[in-house]
Amino acid sequence: MARLTAYERRKFRVRNRIKRTGRLRLSVFRSLKHIYAQIIDDEKGVTLVSASSLALKLKGNKTEVARQVGRALAEKALALGIKQVAFDRGPYKYHGRVKALAEGAREGGLEF
């Protein structure tokens, strides 16, 4: 059996804590150029809402773009009646672009 990397251990630890809450999960994925966010219903295994800097064709400062993606995701979620989610930062530290996305989602009206 292969040993897990620190990245994988962190990802599983954070995700298992969030799944116990029973809330919808706001999951974040960060690449070198773009940031992606989606709200997932783990009970049904369905993505309800998604937004990304790639789909929105946003350019500029990556931190500010992440904030705009968070706002866009919150607007889509509120349109579907989703107000409360659990923030799944995955293996990433709550800092920089991940933090900016979370703040943008809060500004847009999501609670977590």
Curated annotation (Swiss-Prot):
The family database entries (Gene3D superfamilies) matched by this protein are listed as:
3.30.420.100
Question: Is RNA-binding a UniProt keyword of this protein?
Answer: yes
Q: Which Pfam families does UniProt cross-reference here?
A: Ribosomal_L18p
At the top level of its lineage, which domain of life is listed?
A: Bacteria
GO MF, one term, reads: 5S rRNA binding
Membrane-crossing residue ranges in chain numbering: none
* UniProt entry keywords in alphabetical sequence: Ribonucleoprotein, Ribosomal protein, RNA-binding, rRNA-binding
Q: Does the keyword RNA-binding apply?
A: yes
GO BP annotation list: translation
GO cellular component, alphabetical, reads: cytosolic large ribosomal subunit
Under the subunit heading, UniProt states: Part of the 50S ribosomal subunit; part of the 5S rRNA/L5/L18/L25 subcomplex. Contacts the 5S and 23S rRNAs.
Role according to the record: This is one of the proteins that bind and probably mediate the attachment of the 5S RNA into the large ribosomal subunit, where it forms part of the central protuberance.
Family of this protein: Belongs to the universal ribosomal protein uL18 family.
Check the record and name the PANTHER family matching this protein: 39S RIBOSOMAL PROTEIN L18, MITOCHONDRIAL (PTHR12899), LARGE RIBOSOMAL SUBUNIT PROTEIN UL18M (PTHR12899:SF3)
Output this protein's name. Answer: Large ribosomal subunit protein uL18
